[in-house]
């Protein structure tokens, strides 16, 4: 109904966490402390071990990881304790290059890391390093993610991370390495930087219904450029709905069709955006839901009204919603009279609101106006090759070439 510039509700509040590129089984720090047996080639290589950080290093970020370089074997265990002897839990990255603490380290505190490596003949070698973290910085950068612990989302739900300051290009890889996603069952996925402040993760295809998602945005204390450091870590465990709900909206005919698990369950007449405020065509997801809200366009050029609205479901940052519009019932199915929103009747809006989830896929077609990239969660509005090209880290071939599809219909 209107192109609002502000969010109508707390949009799936900034909470939670996220993933590295190879997150199909759980990227980054989701493995156990013990790695598998050494390769046969290690039989002929003398066992050696180098650990990081450098001994007696000071002023390190609280996002510091314990690095290990092993020849002739593999890492067997990592132990990290502070000056009081309190142990810090953590886990090895899948590639074994470093050990990631489960939480940010404390500021201005001394730590000792002990790494044990094992060789092909089960011989062991141990190395330790002691380091001190930096003092608490005065320049904290706000961060957040649109996933909440304990919530259930639709099959198209991306994991969207926001950083409230531009991240320089040379630091985006280090940011992405601190974003972790694990899906159960495992599904290949990747990250895409939509802007210097926003990076989002999606699987190659829609999430399997019933998937469990475990996410961590480990940006607490991470250097983000210009003297700023991430404010905190965020974690969440969420579920994907067991039913796959999909909305398909067309301009000709002016209809909204609801599909549940691929079966058409309801068809509704709609009125879309009028000629000077057309609705966007593209692949979107429901971003937020509000049973009762107020659209206030005062201060927006060409608009000047305040209207209470029921059963509103946000599709774009620019202010396109699906919502009840009893004032346009006579036009629904016949004429486009809205300010860009999808107008439906009160009964249809209530029925739909009760059955949808944040993250359900929505396709709008035939309006003549293309959805702008980044105007909402537009992860599904590009093909897979384009999406993975937006990663700041190399994407494994198994993920890059994963079976993917463009949701119905192609534009």
Language-model segments: residues:
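Conserved hydrophobic/aromatic pocket- or pore-lining residues that grip, position, or stack substrates
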Residues: 256, 286, 313
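Acidic, low-complexity Ser/Thr/Gly/Pro-rich repeat segments typical of extracellular/periplasmic
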Residues: 2-21, 25-243, 398-405, 410
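Solvent-exposed, polar/charged alpha-helical surfaces in well-ordered, non-transmembrane soluble domains
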Residues: 157, 161, 165, 205, ...
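A structural motif detector for short, solvent-exposed N-terminal "entry" segments of globular domains
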Residues: 234-274
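Short, solvent-exposed loop/turn elements at domain surfaces
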Residues: 77-79, 170-172, 256-258, 293-297, ...
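Exported/periplasmic cell-wall-interacting domains
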Residues: 155, 244, 281, 290, ...
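Short beta-strands and strand-coil junctions in structured, solvent-facing domains, enriched
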Residues: 168-170, 222-225, 255, 292-294, ...
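Short, charged beta-turn/beta-strand-edge "cap" motif at the junction between a beta-strand
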Residues: 117-119, 219-221, 262, 292, ...
């Amino acid at each position: 109904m209107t192109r609002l510039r502000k969010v109508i509700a707390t949009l799936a509040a900034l909470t939670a966490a996220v993933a590295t590129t190879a997150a199909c089984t759980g990227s980054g720090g989701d493995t156990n402390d013990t790695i598998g047996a050494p390769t046969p080639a290690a039989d002929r290589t003398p066992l050696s071990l180098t650990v990081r950080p450098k001994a007696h290093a000071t002023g390190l970020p609280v996002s510091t990881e314990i690095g290990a370089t092993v020849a002739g074997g593999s890492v067997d265990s990592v132990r990290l304790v502070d000056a009081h002897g309190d142990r810090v839990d953590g886990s090895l990255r899948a590639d074994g290059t470093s050990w990631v603490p489960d939480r940010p380290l404390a500021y201005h505190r001394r730590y000792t890391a002990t790494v044990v490596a094992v060789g092909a003949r089960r011989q062991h070698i141990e190395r330790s390093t002691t380091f001190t973290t930096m003092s608490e910085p005065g320049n904290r950068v706000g961060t957040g993610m649109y996933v909440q612990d304990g919530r259930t989302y639709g099959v198209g739900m991306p994991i969207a991370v926001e950083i409230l300051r531009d991240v320089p290009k040379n630091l985006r890889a280090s940011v992405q390495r601190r974003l972790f996603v694990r899906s159960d069952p495992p599904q290949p996925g990747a990250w895409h930087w939509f802007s210097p402040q926003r990076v989002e993760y999606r699987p190659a295809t829609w999430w399997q219904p019933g998937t469990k998602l475990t996410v961590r945005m480990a940006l607490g204390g991470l250097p983000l450029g210009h003297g700023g450091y991430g404010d905190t870590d965020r974690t969440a465990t969420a579920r994907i709905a067991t039913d796959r709900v999909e909305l398909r909206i067309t301009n000709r005919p002016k209809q909204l069709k609801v599909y549940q698990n691929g079966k058409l369950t309801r068809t509704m007449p709609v009125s879309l955006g009028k000629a000077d405020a057309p609705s966007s065509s593209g692949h979107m997801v429901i971003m937020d839901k509000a049973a009762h809200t107020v659209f206030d366009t005062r201060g927006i050029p060409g608009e000047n009204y305040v209207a209470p609205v029921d059963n509103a479901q946000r599709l774009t940052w620019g202010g396109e919603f699906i919502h009840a519009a009893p004032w346009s019932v006579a036009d629904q199915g016949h004429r486009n009279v809205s300010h860009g929103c999808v107008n439906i009747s009160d009964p249809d809006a209530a029925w739909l609101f009760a059955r949808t989830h944040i993250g359900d896929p929505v396709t709008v077609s035939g309006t003549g106006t293309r959805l702008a990239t980044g105007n909402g969660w537009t992860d599904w509005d590009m093909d897979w090759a384009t999406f993975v090209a937006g990663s700041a880290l190399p994407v494994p071939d198994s993920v890059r070439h994963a079976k993917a599809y463009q949701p119905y219909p192609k534009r």
